């Protein structure tokens, strides 16, 4: 029997659909209690505050505080980095050394720096000064060995992310520098897996056997841009992400994430979601601006049987004072919804130019749903429709 189409799943689906039916009324009731809906010039990174204001949400949220770091500071130049050269080893050496000494800041100074995968470590703030540009390699070898990641809501071992962390705490990526992904004529792009993730999993049911490393004819899965995984107390603040091969900022299985004052510019590159919250809890997203080739602010919790096996919801998420420019959806739930999306509060935002405003999408084989999803004071100037429910999307592309 297919476990994804039995009666318990139907009950979950019905609950989700009922929540969607009452959703416009929830919007109306909340909106009547507020004075104004923000204009575009009243949201986004230019208005980010120094202090993080208390979070007021219609559900319990912890106090959202930045991680605190020791005064120790290393420049990547001190560990051998030279402009226009590959500096992966120098950056990683600085991060590892600062973490080993109890934490502090690793500084990337102004200049163009070429790198492969960077792995953040506990108690380290990787800080890009204004004028600093990290240009990421498009070669597979620069992202090996493979690491655990989620690709479209399914666990695999592949390239992970351009900036990655696994099972770390008190980590940060900050500053006013830029991170720039490789172009789509690179080796990684040319060797990406050509079948849907469902087909791949059918061929590789054991998670430990899902190794996509590009060797001996194997494909790779496109790396995420920034993806802390199994981490606690994460801060991403101030940086700009450009181009991207795939989803941009994707915390996976994390607890306690703050994303603020971030700019994503990946319009024109398909499947480049802006911020995807993936089976992660206690999240604050504020003062961000996303211009994407896919959905902008997106909530996910795993896909199909694999998502049900992991069974980690995305919950307790607040999005405020943010701007969504071009993209498929301003704020989106799905399409990976297996472990549920709970307690989402989006308020005081502007969606300007997206194809839809608030979007729910999944398909029946993917499981789960959402509950207690609240949206208010959102200004929408859209290229399409305000509210979009797509429960029967295409297998590969929804």
Where are these regions (language model features)?
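A short, hydrophobic/aromatic-rich structural module that often spans a beta strand
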Residues: 180-204, 245, 250-255, 337-356, ...
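Extracellular "leader-to-stem" segments immediately downstream of a signal peptide or signal-anchor
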Residues: 2-4, 10-20, 24-107, 112-125, ...
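A short, flexible beta-alpha/helix-coil linker loop
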Residues: 80-82, 303-305, 394-395
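Beta-rich accessory regions
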Residues: 42, 95-96, 347, 364-398
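Short, T/G/N/S-enriched strand-turn elements that build extracellular solenoid repeat scaffolds
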Residues: 95-99, 114-123, 238, 247-253, ...
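Glycine-rich beta-solenoid repeat tracts in large extracellular/virion proteins
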Residues: 117-120, 133, 137-138, 161-166, ...
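Right-handed parallel beta-helix
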Residues: 130-131, 169-178, 232-242, 255-266, ...
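A short local loop/turn or secondary-structure capping micro-motif enriched for an aromatic residue
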Residues: 135-136, 142-145, 181-182, 188-190, ...
């Amino acid at each position: 029997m297919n476990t994804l189409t039995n009666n318990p799943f139907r009950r979950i689906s019905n609950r989700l659909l009922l929540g969607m039916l009452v959703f416009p009324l929830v919007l109306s009731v909340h909106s009547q209690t507020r004075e104004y809906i923000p204009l575009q010039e009243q949201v986004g990174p230019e208005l980010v505050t120094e202090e993080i204001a208390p979070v007021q949400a219609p559900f319990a949220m912890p106090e959202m505080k930045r991680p605190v770091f020791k005064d120790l500071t290393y420049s990547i130049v001190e560990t051998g980095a030279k402009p226009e050269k590959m500096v992966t080893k120098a950056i990683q050496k600085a991060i590892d050394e600062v973490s080993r000494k109890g934490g502090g800041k690793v500084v990337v100074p102004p200049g163009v720096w070429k790198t492969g995968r960077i792995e953040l470590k506990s108690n380290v703030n990787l800080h890009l000064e204004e004028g600093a540009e990290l240009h990421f390699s498009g070669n597979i070898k620069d992202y090996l060995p493979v690491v655990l990641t989620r690709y479209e809501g399914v666990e695999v071992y592949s390239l992970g992310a351009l900036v990655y962390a696994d099972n770390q705490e008190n980590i940060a990526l900050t500053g006013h520098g830029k991170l720039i992904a490789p172009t789509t004529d690179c080796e990684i792009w040319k060797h990406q897996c050509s079948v849907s993730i469902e087909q791949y999993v059918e061929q590789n049911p054991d998670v430990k056997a899902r190794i996509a490393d590009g060797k001996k004819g194997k494909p790779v899965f496109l790396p995420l841009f920034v993806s802390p995984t199994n981490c606690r107390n994460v801060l991403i603040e101030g940086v700009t992400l450009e181009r991207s091969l795939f989803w941009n900022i994707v915390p996976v299985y994390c607890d306690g994430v703050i994303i603020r004052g971030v700019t994503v510019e990946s319009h024109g590159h398909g499947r480049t979601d802006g911020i995807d919250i993936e089976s992660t809890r206690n999240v604050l997203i504020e003062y961000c601006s996303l211009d994407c080739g896919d959905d902008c602010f997106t909530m996910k919790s795993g896909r199909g049987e694999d998502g049900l096996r992991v069974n980690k919801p995305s919950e307790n998420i607040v999005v405020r004072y943010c701007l969504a420019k071009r993209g498929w959806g301003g704020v989106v739930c799905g399409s990976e919804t297996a472990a549920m999306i709970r307690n989402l509060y989006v308020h005081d935002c502007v969606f300007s130019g997206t194809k839809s405003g608030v979007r729910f999408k999944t398909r029946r084989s993917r499981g789960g749903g959402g509950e207690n999803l609240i949206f208010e004071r959102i200004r929408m100037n859209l290229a399409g429709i305000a509210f979009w429910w797509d429960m029967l999307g295409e297998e590969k592309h929804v």
